[in-house]
Amino acid sequence: MLHNKKSFAKGVFLLITFTVILILIFMPLFTNDKGKKLNGLEFSDDLFNKLSKGSSYFIPTISKSVDKIKGKTFDVTVKLKNPDTAPDTAKVLAIAGINAEVKDTGLKISGDLSKMLALALAASDKLYSDDLVGATALFEGMDGLKGVKLLWTVQSAMIKELQKAKMIEEASVVKHVNEKGIEPAYNFYGIPAENIGHKIPLVAGLLAFYVLYTMWYGYAIFDIFDGVGLSMKKSKVKKEV
């Protein structure tokens, strides 16, 4: 027997409509810029990736930091996680005007630090604009994505070595080039950038829908439980005799 038919019917209705909308969410009802059909989750993921890329362009600011260390030379030996990449890494560094010698499982590198970072930022700028051809040209024919990844790897290995050499400022600049320059460009390559200012109504609508949809399910379960006589009530405080 139902404890409250009205609450139970309301809960079932909410749960059915919740399920119908869930099915619609997983249907390819949306289309992206390239004409590809997307379901609701893919559409929102695509949108927020574009917005993330649009808010991750820091290259002009980082370039100013690199300018401050122009002429600063370094001489370190780094170990690479994959020693097989050492020859190609040495080629990339040579393009930047850095001396690189393959040594055991790593590289002995020296030169003007700003030149290496300038190449990393120039290539990252090309990738951020989805210009793989331009990035590849900077690496003299080596795939632009590969070249940037090699720079990121060797620069990551350099940070601790620079810190050991008391080149704290330089190590900080290298870290920022990797995190704010290379990583966004590499990770968001192929994704168009969107300005959130142009998408405020859509973003607000998606967030409002998310909150409403979550509450929708919660109320459905609550009303169904209430309808069958299962509800949460505050227990009475027992009075001592």
Specify the residue positions occupied by each region the protein language model found.
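Alpha-helical transmembrane signal-anchor/signal-peptide segments
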Residues: 28-57, 194-197
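Hydrophobic secretory-pathway targeting helix
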Residues: 1-40, 207
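Short, aromatic-rich amphipathic segments at membrane interfaces
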Residues: 174-209
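A glycine-rich, hydrophobic loop/mini-helix early in the fold
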Residues: 55-65
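Long, solvent-exposed extracytoplasmic domains/loops
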Residues: 63-173
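Generic structural hydrophobic/aromatic packing signal, biased to beta-strands
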Residues: 16-22, 76, 100, 109, ...
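Juxtamembrane interface at the cytosolic side of transmembrane helices
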Residues: 2-11, 197-241
